[in-house]
Amino acid sequence: MMLPKRNIIHFLRKRAIFIVAAFIALLTVDYSLNTIEITDSKSGPFSLNTPIEDIRLVECFSFSPFCRPVLEFWKWARTSRNLYRSRIPWKRAYLYVKRPALYIPGETVLVEQVYVDRQLEKRNKHGIQIRYGTDGDICEFNTLLGEDVVELREGWSAVLNDFIYLGQPVLLTQRPCETPPTPSIEALKRKELSSVTLTYDDEEKKTIKILQLSDLHYSNSDRPCRDPYPYETAEDCMADAKTTAFVNELLQLEEPDFVLLTGDLINGDTSRDARSSLMKAVSPFVDYNVPFAVNFGNHDDLGDLSREELAKILSQIPGSMGLIGNVSGVGNFVLHSPRKFAIYVLDTKGDTSNRRLCPGYDAITEDQLEWLSSKVADFKYEPIQMAVLHIPLKEFCETEDLVGAFREPCSYSICDPNTAKALKSLRIPLAIAGHDHVNDFCGIHPDYNTYFCFAGGAGFGGYGGHGGYVRRARVFELDPVERAVRTWKRLEWPPEDRKLMLDVQTILV
């Protein structure tokens, strides 16, 4: 017996309403569970201090409203972003962990060891092998993307053997419970000192050498070099690998006392996982045991992490000397060495948030200049005073007696509150910047009597090659006794010229 057409439509409509309602309900439940805050409280199923009792990697279609383990789904906490990212747009994958509601040391069964064996993928889809027992002490798992990524955070380590493969290599990393979780941004700010003090015990050491690296533009998977020069070097030129090779050679050649990274470590708009890119960018300094400080650029926070989150990761990495700061921006701090120097790092931020009032780039703000004035009052008797920026001031390109090349117009904020005038009044005679990749000159401003210096871009992931530009880095040698700064550059190409000191000049401060 055939149902009347009206009954069929009514039946389908009821089913459609039920399906839509179920879809929305599952979506709401999934979203609510994923927004539960994982805290660093002392204990509990959503505490970073409670050992993990199980781990799962869950895959689903992009349109699926519910993408988590089904059994006891309310107990699982998501600990990764979508691991497929843009590689496979119709699929999603997440790492989940489960912690016991009641943890009894020595009795509760936990995850004791995790390793990845791609040979076992057929038996276990992702090759993840887990050993359980009552001695488990893993409190956190993370994922990093890319074949050349490394885990640098203090106390963290990669799980053994192999990568998980989800359209790209995924490195699974772990934190044992004996390593405390990273404090929140607010807690880090509360603990911060007003400056970072660098001490040099060698009494015979007369000079301090600083390597300035700017605009490295790291991503996740290795991409072809952008604008390589000379053009014959383009074949098989992979951006991140070539940048790292250049940085390693500079560290070997110069043996700097510390490294200043003046912005755009990450090519945020092409980096699917900023944490992985950031660790890759600073790994050479950890390998060579060279302290470093990061001044963020306008590209660093264009990916999936904010400046605050990037600063939080840096706080966990050995050798990182930066601070978050308590004024506008992230990363306003002083590097100070008694009787030697005071280096003032200012966050020039990125694109403006109010394009009508201030189109283009954001500006240094009045509270930053007030902070700078207060810090100069603390350290004004140090022989060498320097300011560090990413985005230059317009006065950089009003300088005279240039040593180096002026290849592109300056990119600067049109809303700057006259920072150059403040530098003059505070008697800071030298300011350095990045951002303009193919400008690499030092010059003196005729009105302010301040030296402004560009580093030039060092990374192959950002633009370059204009006017025959070869990637390079700048070196500063500070002589506190003579109150002098000697500076030069090192070129990446040709190999036989890498040991040549280009455009050597001495700046009396």
UniProtKB/Swiss-Prot annotation:
Query: In terms of domain of life, where is this protein from?
Result: Eukaryota
Question: One Pfam family from the UniProt entry?
Answer: Metallophos
Gene Ontology cellular component terms for the protein in this record: endoplasmic reticulum
Give an example GO molecular function.
phosphoprotein phosphatase activity
Q: What GO biological process term is on the record, naming one?
A: endoplasmic reticulum unfolded protein response
Signal peptide from the UniProt entry:
1-32
Among its keywords, does the record have Signal? yes
Q: What is this protein called?
A: Uncharacterized protein C1020.05
Q: Keywords of this protein's UniProt record, alphabetized?
A: Endoplasmic reticulum, Signal
Q: Which organism is it from?
A: Schizosaccharomyces pombe (strain 972 / ATCC 24843)
Checking PANTHER family in the record gives: PHOSPHATASE DCR2-RELATED, PHOSPHATASE DCR2-RELATED-RELATED
On whether Endoplasmic reticulum is a keyword of this UniProt record, the answer is yes
Localized where?
A: Endoplasmic reticulum
InterPro entries (UniProt xref): Calcineurin-like_PHP_ApaH, Metallo-depent_PP-like
